[in-house]
Curated annotation (Swiss-Prot):
Pfam families for the chain: IU_nuc_hydro
Chief localization: cytoplasm
Gene3D superfamilies: Ribonucleoside hydrolase-like (3.90.245.10)
Compartments, record wording: Cytoplasm; Nucleus
UniProt key word Hydrolase: yes
Active site (UniProt): H239
UniProt name for this protein: Uncharacterized protein C1683.06c
């Protein structure tokens, strides 16, 4: 299956790309970057480094939006560190990003492939996708689906009491995408908070006989220490790799189709995912919203796939 990853790397963003590259079922056509965890100059540099780590400097990287549609930029350096890749030291990128804008790459790639053949995995704010919708709405409709790490229901928020980070950074973009009519699969905090990066699981990654395993372990030890302390768990949640894992193993997830809207008016609940799980509203379902995951099987697949890399 052909995919584009739209991302703001971030340690767990990089693990998402590594999982995709390690999986023969997936053809990663390109990586597009957006401001989120850190500014776009850093997310682009990190994307280049993660592809070098995987031994795939041939995969194109296009820099995208450096700010949300309407709001001031918000970062998560308190989680990911100043560079977004704290925890492991990687060599400088072997190349520069590709010429051109991420939005144009997304549009051109969808235009040049058969309709319904490309999945967009979004693991950062949805600014690039919203801009593509605004620029070429008829082209973006050619996407097979968008699989996004975004939102929350029972877990509510991780950046404010009401909002998940990727949505909160650019809630207006998120609402545009959710209103687009494109098939959407949402991996919310309800899923990711079941996937504890325990010391035992990290140790298994560190023991992989390649260069990727120890780097991933170092990333997770750094990034997830903050969240483990915050939530009082045996390891912080693992967020972004769920997008690619769902493509590989949808059988380990469960959920249902519901309506999801994003709050864009109230400062108190800005960016809240309003999930009609109990179908009490009148709006039609626009999202496949997932709520449970087999955490042990998730990590078995992830660790095995990471072990295939250099």
């Amino acid at each position: 299956m052909k995919i584009i990853i739209d991302t703001d790397p971030g340690q767990d963003d990089a693990i998402t790309a590594l999982l995709a590259i390690a999986s023969p079922e997936i053809e990663l056509l390109g990586v597009t970057t957006v401001a989120g965890n850190v500014p776009v100059s850093m997310t682009t540099r990190n994307a280049l480094q993660m592809l070098d780590l995987a031994g795939r400097p041939d995969i194109p990287v296009y820099a995208g939006s450096n700010k949300p549609l309407l709001r001031a930029p918000i970062t998560a350096t308190h989680v990911h560190g100043a560079s977004g890749f704290e925890g492991a030291v990687l060599p400088p990128p072997s190349r520069k990003e590709n010429e051109g804008h991420a939005v144009d790459f997304i549009i051109d790639t969808l235009r040049n492939n058969e309709p319904g053949t490309i999945t967009i995995c979004t693991i950062g704010p949805l600014t690039n996708i919203a801009l593509a919708l605004n620029k070429a709405p008829e082209v973006i409709q050619r996407a097979k689906q968008i699989v996004m790490m975004a939102g929350a229901f029972s877990e509510v928020g991780n950046i404010t009491p009401a909002a998940e980070f990727n949505i909160y950074v650019d809630p207006h973009a998120a609402q545009m995408v959710l209103s687009s009519g494109i098939p959407i699969v949402m991996m919310p905090l309800d899923i990711t908070h079941q996937l504890h990066t325990s010391a035992k699981r990290i140790a298994r990654m560190e023991a992989l006989p390649n260069r990727v395993g120890p780097v991933v372990a170092a990333w997770l030890r750094m990034e997830k220490a903050y969240e483990a302390k915050k939530y009082g768990t045996d390891g912080g949640p693992l967020h972004d790799p769920n997008t690619v894992m769902w493509l590989l193993r949808p059988d380990i997830y469960s959920g249902r189709k519901v309506n999801v809207q994003i709050e864009t008016q109230s400062e108190l609940t800005m960016g809240m995912s309003v999930v009609d799980w109990w179908q009490v509203g009148l709006l039609p379902a626009n999202v496949t919203f997932l709520r449970t995951v087999d955490d042990d099987e998730f990590y078995e697949v992830l660790i095995e796939r990471l072990g295939r890399l250099p």
